[in-house]
């Protein structure tokens, strides 16, 4: 009895494998070779290409060393919090590796002088200032489908005004128009973004929901589609000012990884964004180095491998800026211990009430 049962199972397994082979060959005949495959047979799927954000601590918090290529990323926050700065720093890092980048400036507010200060190569940056939301998303779609773009930034979702709204009268009520536009565009874009390995960064603004009694009243513009399609969502906030004597020279910034499909989410980091310079890389090296025990702090003095960096954080930053080889050595050591730093020293913000569902996607 047991032998008959065993034979029956074996026959079924043979039938299953033959049926699977027939189904696979039929799919390949209909849709082309490579339309279906075993995941392990394609090595390119396993390796996730990344682009640095320009912030070492944020790269570590993201868990994969930067923002993922072939994915949609959303950066949102209040006004003047550093959203465009972070996107431009990502473009600058991609260009350093020879990548081709594009900037769809729906807000018509890109400052080329500031972008150059952040390290962006303006000669090789493609820029478009579209008149309507449809035009902006059509340009985005065409560039993504070309397969030649590495990083594309759309600034911002709130400025993607539907054509019907522009052609209508001031004060016309057109509910849900922008949300429908974004939903349709993302359905169309998502497959070509993956195939072309293009990173598309959407910058978004914050609005307040009226009548919310419990949880956060904040929401982002453009409906819910972007929350679902985005692989990474970053919430960026200005939490204070960086001063030299009485003069304000930068912003203290907090970034929370609200959603992350590539690694554990909810990591939270803080760094300085200096005016006319961008993310203070030397400041991050000092702060992270002390947390990880790579840079020693004794009283007000900072030292690395028995070499004094300076008295006080600002002097240590200046020393590292003047000694780039030493700064690179500390950065390399921090990146090699990225997993340990992420687990032990980066804050875990936890899900917010309004972002918990999206973050779990």
UniProtKB/Swiss-Prot annotation:
Key word Nucleotidyltransferase present: no
Keyword annotations from UniProtKB, A to Z: ATP-binding, Cytoplasm, DNA damage, DNA recombination, DNA repair, DNA-binding, Nucleotide-binding, SOS response
Subcellular location as annotated: Cytoplasm
Main location (coarse class): cytoplasm
UniProt-annotated binding residues for ATP: 77-84
GO biological process per UniProt: DNA recombination; DNA repair; SOS response
Any one GO cellular component localisation term in the record: cytosol
Family matches, as Gene3D superfamilies: P-loop containing nucleotide triphosphate hydrolases
GO molecular function, one term: damaged DNA binding
InterPro entries, alphabetized: AAA+_ATPase (IPR003593), DNA_recomb/repair_RecA (IPR013765), DNA_recomb/repair_RecA_CS (IPR020584), P-loop_NTPase (IPR027417), RecA-like_C (IPR049261), RecA-like_N (IPR049428), RecA_ATP-bd (IPR020588), RecA_C_sf (IPR023400)
Keyword DNA-binding applies: yes
Function: Can catalyze the hydrolysis of ATP in the presence of single-stranded DNA, the ATP-dependent uptake of single-stranded DNA by duplex DNA, and the ATP-dependent hybridization of homologous single-stranded DNAs. It interacts with LexA causing its activation and leading to its autocatalytic cleavage.
Family named by the database record: Belongs to the RecA family.
Cited PANTHER family: MITOCHONDRIAL DNA REPAIR PROTEIN RECA HOMOLOG-RELATED (PTHR45900:SF1), RECA (PTHR45900)
Protein name: Protein RecA
GN (gene name): recA
């Amino acid at each position: 009895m047991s032998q008959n049962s065993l034979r029956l199972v074996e026959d079924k397994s043979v039938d299953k494998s033959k049926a699977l082979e027939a189904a696979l060959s039929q799919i390949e005949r209909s849709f082309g070779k490579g339309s279906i495959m075993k995941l392990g047979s394609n090595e390119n799927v396993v390796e996730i290409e990344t682009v640095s954000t320009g912030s070492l601590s944020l790269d570590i918090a993201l868990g994969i060393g930067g923002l993922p290529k072939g994915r949609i990323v959303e950066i949102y926050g209040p006004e003047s919090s550093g959203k465009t700065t972070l996107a431009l720093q990502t473009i600058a890092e991609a260009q350093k590796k020879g990548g081709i980048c594009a900037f769809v400036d729906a807000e018509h507010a890109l400052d080329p002088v500031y972008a150059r200060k952040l390290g962006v190569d303006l000669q090789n940056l493609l820029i478009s200032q579209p008149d309507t939301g449809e035009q902006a998303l059509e340009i985005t779609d065409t560039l993504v489908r070309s397969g030649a773009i590495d990083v594309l930034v759309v600034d911002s979702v709130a400025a993607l005004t539907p054509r019907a709204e522009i052609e209508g009268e001031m004060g016309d009520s057109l509910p849900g128009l922008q949300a429908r536009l974004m939903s349709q565009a993302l359905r169309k874009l998502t497959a070509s973004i993956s195939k072309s390995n293009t990173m598309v960064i959407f910058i978004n603004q914050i609005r307040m929901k009226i009548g919310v009694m419990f949880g956060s009243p904040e929401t982002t513009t453009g409906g819910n589609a972007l929350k679902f399609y985005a692989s990474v969502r970053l919430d960026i906030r200005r939490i204070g000012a960086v001063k030299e004597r009485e003069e304000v020279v930068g912003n203290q910034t907090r970034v929370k990884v609200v959603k992350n499909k590539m690694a554990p989410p909810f990591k939270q980091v803080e760094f300085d964004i200096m005016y006319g310079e961008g993310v203070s890389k030397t400041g991050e090296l000092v702060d992270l180095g002390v947390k990880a025990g790579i840079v020693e702090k004794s009283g007000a003095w900072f030292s690395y491998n028995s070499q004094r960096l300076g008295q006080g954080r600002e002097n240590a930053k200046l020393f590292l800026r003047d000694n780039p080889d030493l700064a690179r050595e500390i950065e390399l050591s921090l990146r090699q211990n990225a997993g340990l730093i992420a687990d032990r020293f980066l804050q875990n913000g936890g899900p917010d009430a309004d972002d918990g569902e999206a973050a779990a996607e």
